[in-house]
Amino acid sequence: MERVTIIGIIFAILVVGWILATGQWAYGNVVGPLVNHSKIPLLKITYVSAYENAKGTYLILNITDCCGPDAYPASAPIMEIYNSTWHVFLYSYNISNDTVKVIQAPWNENKKDYTNWYSGFVVILGSEAQFQLQLPFHLSPGTYHIKLYTPAVSSKVLAKQTATFTIS
């Protein structure tokens, strides 16, 4: 073999060794489990209120995205409203059609929260918005729970995306 080829092979082995060594040192993923430290979106309902009107139930939700990546917003394409005897699922197209107003928080300067037919509620990391929905059905008096379903989250996270309200 030529001298240049031998030096190239030795250099390549050293580079691969350096990459594997720093990967093991920093992340422990050469020998051991592969670790993914990416954040999972977490939507929180900070306020909920509802009242009956002639058209059905008027629902007011303050939703914030308090954890997750800032490269793309968190979404909740499914919302469940339930109590001990009854439940309904609102899918993204229902959420989009029933939303009559979105009030942005004052600190939402550049990116705005919104709804659409595909993603349902769309909330930017660190922002908060009030979503006002006119539901086309009446809720009987009682205590209800709302749960927002975010794609790819565990049941522990879903438990945190729940709020309670009362219709009197």
UniProtKB/Swiss-Prot annotation:
Subunit structure: Heterodimer of a large and a small subunit in a 2:2 stoichiometry. TQO may associate with the terminal oxidase formed by doxBCE.
Gene assigned in the entry: doxA
Protein species of origin: Acidianus ambivalens (Desulfurolobus ambivalens)
Entry PTM: The N-terminus is blocked. Glycosylated.
Disulfide bonds: none
Location in the cell: Cell membrane
Protein name, as recorded: Thiosulfate dehydrogenase [quinone] small subunit
Pfam families: DoxA
Temperature dependence: Increasing activity in the range between 20 and 92 degrees Celsius.
NCBIfam families for the chain: TQO_small_DoxA
Main location: membrane
